[in-house]
């Protein structure tokens, strides 16, 4: 009964979120990009709740995703270009189709040996994040000889993102002692492959049901008229639903680049952009969120990462010294970690895929450069409870335990107990 009541209350409080998602994307079409969203296109106001009187920050721990990048797949660009080139050979492109193909062919030249690489936009995102971290928590990052341990997965774009943030931290405090580490030995918690119950649950994804959802929300007819002058030829010769989705992926990721044909996003109407976002929202939720379809187990893919965060915090809190731990990886870790930690509404469980957009919006969790920060506070004088505050993409988040009298500040002992028991229960 309690669970049902919770979901009913959730419906009351979160129904406006569906309207907000549509309004968000109409106002800022780039949010339809899901994991391709440029971090700097949805910055918060950076107004934070002051710590309880007498408390000061002393430890910072974090996991962050790399910044904006080129698309990864070897065929991600060419699979869009090929059908348009085929249409050009048969004289089936409209004038707009010719323009779009020309833009894509020209841009494709820049992708040579660049697939998956960090872009200048991505580098800039991390310079901004690093600079703000130092500004927001000077008690930690401007303290003399502060120790900063920064680790990255072995992927170049993650390493360069780490470098960009650390450059800003060093610029803010030349006395900082920064240790950088990159190794396969760290992958077991920075970016671990699925295994055990998580891997088994991933196999429960109902591809037929998701495919039907995707088809219901893909309406290529208008776009095909924009690109092709012969609709019968297009229907017979082009996989129209597939082309629409793949062209959208290329167009929406143009925000990851400086001097790119970013206006390609205008090929899609507001309704089409929203539909394509809903498709991706569902896909990410089922594979990485707290989805009933995958047994509500996918967030536990970050079991090792949360364990590392807890254990490292134990050591640093016991030492009591001013220091920081930074980790750099991927959205496939940030997304389930945010769910596992139960930051804000990230861990909501929704059965009806058609209703998901009302309760859960992926662009709020994992844009390019997304990050989770935990800041620990202790009494400036004397003894007292250690407090912790969570930020998701530099926004204050609620946590799944009772807060102190000051919103967004929680007793670390309570939070640690909750997370530890949750992990232990899963591991039984």
Task: Write out the residue ranges for each language-model feature.
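Signature for phosphate-centric chemistry
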Residues: 19-149, 153-325, 329-428
């Amino acid at each position: 009964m309690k669970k049902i009541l919770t979901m009913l209350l959730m419906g009351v409080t979160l129904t406006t979120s569906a309207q907000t998602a549509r309004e968000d994307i109409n106002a800022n079409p780039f949010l339809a990009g899901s994991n391709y969203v440029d971090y700097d296109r949805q910055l918060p106001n950076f107004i934070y709740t002051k710590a309880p009187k007498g408390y000061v920050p002393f430890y910072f721990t974090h996991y962050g995703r790399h910044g904006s990048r080129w698309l990864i797949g070897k065929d991600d660009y060419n699979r869009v270009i090929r059908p348009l080139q085929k249409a050009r050979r048969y004289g089936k492109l409209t004038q707009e189709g010719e323009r779009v193909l020309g833009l894509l062919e020209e841009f494709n030249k820049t992708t040579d040996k660049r697939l998956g690489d960090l872009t200048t936009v991505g580098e800039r995102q991390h310079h901004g994040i690093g600079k703000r971290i130092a500004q927001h928590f000077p008690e930690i990052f401007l303290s003399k000889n502060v120790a900063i341990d920064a680790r990255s997965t072995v992927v170049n774009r993650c390493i360069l993102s780490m470098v960009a943030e650390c450059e800003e931290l060093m610029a803010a405090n030349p006395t900082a002692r920064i240790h950088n580490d990159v190794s396969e030995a760290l992958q077991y918690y920075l970016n671990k492959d699925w295994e055990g119950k998580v891997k088994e649950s991933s196999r429960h994804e109902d591809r037929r049901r998701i495919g039907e959802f995707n088809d219901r929300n893909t309406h290529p007819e208008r776009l095909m008229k924009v690109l092709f002058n012969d609709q019968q030829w297009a229907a017979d010769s082009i996989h129209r639903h597939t082309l629409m989705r793949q062209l959208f992926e290329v167009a929406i990721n143009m925000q990851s680049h400086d001097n790119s044909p970013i206006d390609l996003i205008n090929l899609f109407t507001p309704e089409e952009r929203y539909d394509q976002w809903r498709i991706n929202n569902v896909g990410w939720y089922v594979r990485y969120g707290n989805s009933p379809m995958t047994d509500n187990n996918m967030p536990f893919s970050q079991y090792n990462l949360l364990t590392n965060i807890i254990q490292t915090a134990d050591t640093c809190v016991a030492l009591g010294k001013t220091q920081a731990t930074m980790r750099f990886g991927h959205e496939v870790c940030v997304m389930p970690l945010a769910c596992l930690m139960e930051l804000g509404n990230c861990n909501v469980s929704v059965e009806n895929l058609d209703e998901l957009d009302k309760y859960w919006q992926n662009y709020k969790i994992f844009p390019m450069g997304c990050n989770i920060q935990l800041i620990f506070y202790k009494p400036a004088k004397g003894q007292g409870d250690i407090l912790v505050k969570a930020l998701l993409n530099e926004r204050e988040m609620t946590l799944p335990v009772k807060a102190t009298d000051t919103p967004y500040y929680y007793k670390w002992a309570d939070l640690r107990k909750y997370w530890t028991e949750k992990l232990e229960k899963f591991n039984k």
